[in-house]
From Swiss-Prot:
Designated name of the protein: P2X purinoceptor 2
Gene that produces this protein: P2RX2
Binding site for ATP: K81, K83, T196, S296, N300, R302, K319
Topological domains annotated Cytoplasmic: 1-42, 359-471
GO biological process, one term: detection of hypoxic conditions in blood by carotid body chemoreceptor signaling
Lineage summary: Eukaryota, Metazoa, Chordata, Craniata, Vertebrata
Family statement drawn from the similarity comment of this UniProt entry: Belongs to the P2X receptor family.
Glycosylation sites: N133, N194, N310
């Protein structure tokens, strides 16, 4: 029967573990070069290195331009101006009426359809049938003094006939008649596709002290006769409204009836290592509001025009549907800088070592002679002091370049340890200074290992416990 393993107290085990961790903290590791002559492993190693180099050269340096210092989000100013006239069923509309607000900022609306409720005055009238709990059968259904936040006025407590039809609604005091009862629709979209929009944009990158605008520096009246064309008139930022809607992939008639939000996106991506003439704006157009969501699609707003008739304040309430234009500017500028170049070069050179790590893992895990490779790859050198306290032990003796001291036998003169004791002796260092072995080859830091691909793994003989005879 096998002898029972000794059981250590829990405290002793913890102390041994702590001492082992403390001792391992002060170990020093130095790389050891082993040349393994294996074609498949060598091809894999060079292939991994090539892939890493291609990634850094093509993607990191050419595509991402990581050798440059960059700045995003330029300082920007936008001035807009709309021109054109249109007609509806009842009148002619000019810019002052259909553009809101008139200041010409980065966000503005062009009205394409209106629902107007004329001659509203303060008085009593039937509530809109669309308001919740507005319908009634008798005065008992209407509570006097009740105010509905989604309604049009203060309820008087009377149930009165609606504007048209047999229905009845509660009477309210407010601006009468209410919107749904007397509104008139007018469509302005007949000539709207021909409206012209001037978008003047200037950007500045403060880090690089670089500024530029999107209008050509010409004094011959160029802007009065040009319209935008990406190839021939890039610096003529005058767009037709129909062109913007078409580029956004929308139907102008549908958009004019329901309203919507169109984004004009100006992108300034500038490589400042090139001349300033190579830094040009790029325009794109897309719809910003979710048109397929009924609850939030479309765009409309209300405003009123006030006047007096015989001393009575009167107003015209207008519910306007239109196309809102949002001008959005973004960009990025880059210029060569030594610091990011050095950082990315160092990262590239360091990443090449991934190939060595991968091949080492394959070598020590899947190759036929993995135990022999492990022995060649990892050495443990213990350098305790002599009993007399002599220190230091020279590095040449540790690496095996110096001959052993007189009176010490070499490794070949020592008897082979019994089976099962070799691993214990290799893992621990005795209290006395052990004999240092000379390096078995000429170079202390590089070893040559031949690994024929077809050679099967062989078991080590008792006279060669480490399997070195296979090398």
């Amino acid at each position: 029967m096998a002898a029972a393993q000794p059981k250590y107290p829990a405290g002793a085990t913890a102390r041994r573990l702590a001492r082992g961790c403390w001792s391992a903290l002060w170990d020093y590791e130095t790389p050891k070069v082993i040349v393994v002559r294996n074609r498949r492993l060598g091809v894999l190693y060079r292939a991994v290195q090539l892939l890493i180099l291609l990634y850094f050269v093509w993607y990191v340096f050419i595509v991402q331009k990581s050798y440059q210092e960059s700045e995003t989000g330029p300082e920007s100013s936008i001035i807009t101006k709309v021109k054109g006239i249109t007609t509806s069923e009842h009148k002619v509309w000019d810019v002052e009426e259909y553009v809101k607000p008139p200041e010409g900022g980065s966000v503005f609306s062009i009205i394409t359809r209106v629902e107007a409720t004329h001659s509203q005055t303060q008085g009593t009238c039937p509530e809109s049938i669309r308001v919740h709990n507005a319908t009634c059968l008798s005065d008992a259904d209407c509570v006097a003094g009740e105010l509905d936040m989604l309604g049009n006025g203060l309820r008087t407590g009377r149930c009165v006939p609606y504007y048209q039809g047999p229905s009845k609604t509660c009477e309210v005091f407010g601006w009468c008649p209410v919107e749904d009862g007397a509104s008139v629709s007018q469509f302005l979209g007949t000539m709207a596709p021909n409206f012209t929009i001037l978008i003047k944009n200037s950007i500045h990158y403060p880090k690089f002290h670089f500024s530029k605008g999107n209008i050509a520096d010409r004094t011959d009246g160029y802007l009065k006769r040009c319209t935008f064309h990406e190839a021939s008139d890039l610096y003529c930022p005058i767009f037709k409204l129909g062109f913007i809607v078409e580029k956004a992939g929308e139907s102008f008639t549908e958009l004019a009836h329901k309203g919507g939000v169109i984004g004009v996106i100006i992108n300034w991506d500038c490589d400042l290592d090139l001349p300033a003439s190579e830094c040009n704006p790029k325009y794109s157009f897309r719809r910003l509001d979710p048109k397929h969501v009924p609850a939030s699609s479309g765009y409309n707003f209300r405003f009123a025009k006030y006047y007096k008739i015989n001393g009575t304040t009167t107003r015209t309430l207008i519910k306007a549907y239109g196309i809102r234009i949002d001008v959005i500017v973004h960009g990025q500028a880059g210029k060569f800088s030594l610091i990011p170049t050095i950082i990315n070069l160092a990262t590239a050179l360091t990443s090449v070592g991934v190939g060595s790590f991968l091949c080492d893992w394959i070598l020590l895990t899947f190759m036929n002679k993995n135990k022999v490779y492990s022995h060649k790859k990892f050495d443990k050198v213990c350098t305790p002091s002599h009993p007399s306290g002599s220190w230091p032990v020279t590095l040449a003796r540790v690496l095996g370049q110096a001959p052993p001291e007189p009176g010490h036998r070499s490794e070949d003169q020592h008897p082979s340890p019994p089976s099962g004791q070799e691993g214990q002796q290799g893992a621990e260092c005795g209290p006395a200074f052990p004999p240092l072995r000379p390096c078995p080859i000429s170079a202390p830091s590089e070893q040559m290992v031949d690994t024929p691909a077809s050679e099967p793994a062989q078991a080590s003989t008792p006279t060669d416990p480490k399997g070195l005879a296979q090398l």
